[in-house]
């Protein structure tokens, strides 16, 4: 079965071409002049490192790993999370304000390396992949001031970052989504944005367009009592499936935080129920653990890689 990327995170071919030309320059111009009678590139292929990017893999607090961004990419993740604080004019990345360091910024840890990666991989974060990696920017400091700084910075990367103009999405290799202290009023008023808005379950049914709110995230423990031990109660399973269906019907992707993350059977049980329901992103600090689970237990990833699904543990 041919695997198709989530529609909301697939790069249109014209956007890919524009990105390649802008980022790679003369090399891309030469490539563009070559004959176009070759077969179309598959929707999803292995990267130059032999990895298939994992559609559901979200690196929670990614910056706490030994190699921020790069560890996640080496495990095939397609969504990474960075907490930011506006300090002395810099967007510093850390979980707590006391842990911020000058120079350890959104640009140095994420935007500049991603731009270089896209140049190296000829227009995509993963070679041959037509998707967009999600950069979830969790604003920890004052919302309006920090978003203004984030917006100024993202506009310096027009060929890297997805933008929305007049409600229309122009996909690029990286898509920023603002979480945490979100300045919804300013974001709503912008005619051109370089970031989407991370909604909550309370936003479902409000008619908010996916062009503004591409992602909905919420705290698992505030919605469900089940934490993976024993069978999932049928009422909670039905609730999860309803939430997924409602999110997808509106064009949103869905993520939960505060899910169990110790390497136990409870974590795998919760991940399996989430995959079965169609939750779009699984939240973890354990990069290797989630990669192993998705490559062996997720039918979507198994089909994409062309290998049989392993039996559940």
Model-predicted segments: where are they?
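Beta-loop motif signature
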Residues: 61
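Secretory targeting and sorting signals
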Residues: 1-34
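A structural motif detector for short, solvent-exposed N-terminal "entry" segments of globular domains
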Residues: 65-70
């Amino acid at each position: 079965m041919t695997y198709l990327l989530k529609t909301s995170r697939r790069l249109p071919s014209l956007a890919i071409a524009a990105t390649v030309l802008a980022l790679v320059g003369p090399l891309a111009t030469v490539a563009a002049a070559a004959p176009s009678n070759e077969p179309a590139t598959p929707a999803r292929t292995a990267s130059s490192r032999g990895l298939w990017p994992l559609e559901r893999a979200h690196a929670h607090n990614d910056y706490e790993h030994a190699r921020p961004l790069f560890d996640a990419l080496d495990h095939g993740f397609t969504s990474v999370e960075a907490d930011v604080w506006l300090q002395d004019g810099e967007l510093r990345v850390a979980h707590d304000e006391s842990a911020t360091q000058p120079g350890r910024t959104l640009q140095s840890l994420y935007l500049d390396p991603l731009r270089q990666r896209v140049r190296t991989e000829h227009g995509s974060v993963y070679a041959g992949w037509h998707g967009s990696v999600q950069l979830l920017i969790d604003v920890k400091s004052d919302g309006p001031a920090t978003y203004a700084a984030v917006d100024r910075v993202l506009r310096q990367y027009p060929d890297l970052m997805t933008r929305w103009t007049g409600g229309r999405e122009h996909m690029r290799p990286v898509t920023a989504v603002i979480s945490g202290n979100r300045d919804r009023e300013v974001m709503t008023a912008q005619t051109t944005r370089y970031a989407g808005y991370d909604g909550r379950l309370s936003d479902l049914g409000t008619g908010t367009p996916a062009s503004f709110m591409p992602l909905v995230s919420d705290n698992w423990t505030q919605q469900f009592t089940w934490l993976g031990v024993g069978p999932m109660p049928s009422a909670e399973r039905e609730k999860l499936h309803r939430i997924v269906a409602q999110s997808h019907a509106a064009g949103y992707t869905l993520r939960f935080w505060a899910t169990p993350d110790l390497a136990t059977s409870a974590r795998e049980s919760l991940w399996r129920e989430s995959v079965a329901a169609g939750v779009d992103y699984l939240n973890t600090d354990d990069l290797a653990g989630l990669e192993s689970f998705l490559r062996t237990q997720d039918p979507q990833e198994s089909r994409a890689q062309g290998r049989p699904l392993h039996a559940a543990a």
